UniProtKB/Swiss-Prot annotation:
Signal peptide positions on this chain: none
Annotated InterPro entries: 2-IPM_HCS-like (IPR050073), 4OH_2_O-val_aldolase (IPR017629), Aldolase_TIM (IPR013785), DmpG_comm (IPR012425), DRE_TIM_HOA (IPR035685), PYR_CT (IPR000891)
Positions contributing to substrate binding: R12, D13, S166, H195, Y300
NCBIfam families tied to this protein: 4OH_2_O_val_ald (TIGR03217), PRK08195.1 (NF006049)
Organism: Salinispora arenicola (strain CNS-205)
Record protein name field: 4-hydroxy-2-oxovalerate aldolase 1
Site feature: Transition state stabilizer: R12
Catalytic reaction list: (S)-4-hydroxy-2-oxopentanoate = acetaldehyde + pyruvate
Domain Pyruvate carboxyltransferase: residue ranges: 4-258
């Protein structure tokens, strides 16, 4: 039986979809619904991780502590988890989250910068936390290079390492190649995870591919008995940056059809998506001309709303901004460059 570890990211990546404006009460309500539906883990933080609330990334409607405490009040079976980006959050922030009830953390770096996660992963492991490495913008490193970065995170103490498609740019073959590369280098006990975005409408398909390839140990052929648990990120109604993440309720329905062990009530997830999350979306989370441009150009999905504001302010097409950001290979943390790009494009149009 293929075993899945489903982690909901509605209350972290989903922050991007509503400009980090969840109230503590909304977090409490959504977390309770996810817990009742049987989800394994629920991630809670500002969209850019612990301590992400700032001028650069956007201020939250509440603090990380308020959001985490609200979720902790209602969870009965789901693991409370969070995300930390070294350089934004610190070990002190992680310690504070742990004291509030967080037992699991993902340490996120750019796909070529695993070495900056060493202290954070090691601290989490030494302090009894479940810890994963999270290699963002995975399309910007080739399979062998990405696997080498994953091996570094494993060496620091990560229980799991993710292929993280922050730009929604990976095709199904790209996911297969990267997961296969992970299998060749990671120890059998190290889990493999997938974090998909839906910018090319491949969020669910890419997650399925990751499971099919990631569940096999070593060089075993596809279809061999599953030997590894695969972690899959998803969110209610796809709530997340860009066109959103793999929609949780859709992925669980597909997993059910595959006969995979997921432990969730698909109807309860459908209800939570429709009744609790979709009404909060001031901008529909969907594939449209702007979010498709993110995936087409391979741009960090959380750049979307920043780019839309810059486009409106400077009178340029948001797609032009996104394509230029992709051409310049901008990555998470370079949000300030979005305005520079918009100004450059506006200047070109005037000359």
């Amino acid at each position: 039986m293929t075993r899945l570890y489903l982690q909901d990211v509605t209350l972290r990546d989903g922050m991007h979809a509503i400009a980090h404006r969840y109230t503590a009460d909304q977090v409490r309500t959504i977390a309770a619904a996810l817990d009742a539906a049987g989800i394994a883990a629920i991630e809670v933080a500002h969209g850019d991780g612990l301590a992400g609330s700032s001028v650069n990334y956007g201020h939250g409607a509440a603090s990380d502590a308020d959001w985490i405490a609200a979720a902790a009040e209602v969870l009965t079976t789901a693991r409370l988890t969070t995300l930390l980006v070294p350089g934004i959050g610190t070990i002190a922030d992680l310690r504070a989250a742990r004291e509030l009830g967080v037992t699991s953390v993902r340490i996120a770096t750019h796909c070529t910068e695993a070495d900056i996660s060493a202290q954070h992963i090691s601290w989490a492991r030494e302090n009894g936390m479940d810890v994963s490495g999270f290699l963002m913008m995975s399309h910007m490193n080739d399979p062998a290079g990405l696997a080498a970065q994953a091996k570094l995170m494993e060496s620091y103490g990560a229980h799991c390492v993710y292929v993280t498609d922050s730009g929604g740019r990976l095709l199904m073959s790209d996911v297969a190649e990267r997961v296969d590369a992970y299998r060749q280098v990671l120890e059998p006990e190290t889990q493999i995870g997938i974090h998909a975005h839906h910018n090319l409408s491949l969020g669910v398909a890419n997650s399925v591919i990751a499971v099919e390839h990631g569940r096999i140990l070593g060089d075993g052929p596809l279809g061999a008995p599953a030997g590894r648990t695969v972690r899959v990120d998803a969110s209610l109604a796809g709530q997340g940056a860009g066109a959103g993440n793999a929609p949780l309720e859709v992925f669980v329905a597909v997993a059910e059809l595959h006969g995979w062990e997921h432990g969730c009530d698909v109807f309860a997830l459908m209800d939570a998506a429709e009744d609790l999350v979709r009404p909060l979306q001031d901008r529909p989370v969907r594939v449209d001309r702007e979010t498709l441009s993110l995936g087409y150009a391979g741009v960090y999905s959380s750049f979307l709303r920043h780019a839309e504001r810059a486009a409106e302010r400077y009178g340029v097409d948001v797609r032009s901004i996104l394509i230029e950001l992709g051409r310049r290979r901008m990555v998470g943390g370079q949000e300030d460059m979005i305005v520079d790009v918009a100004l450059d494009l506006a200047g070109r149009e005037k000359t």
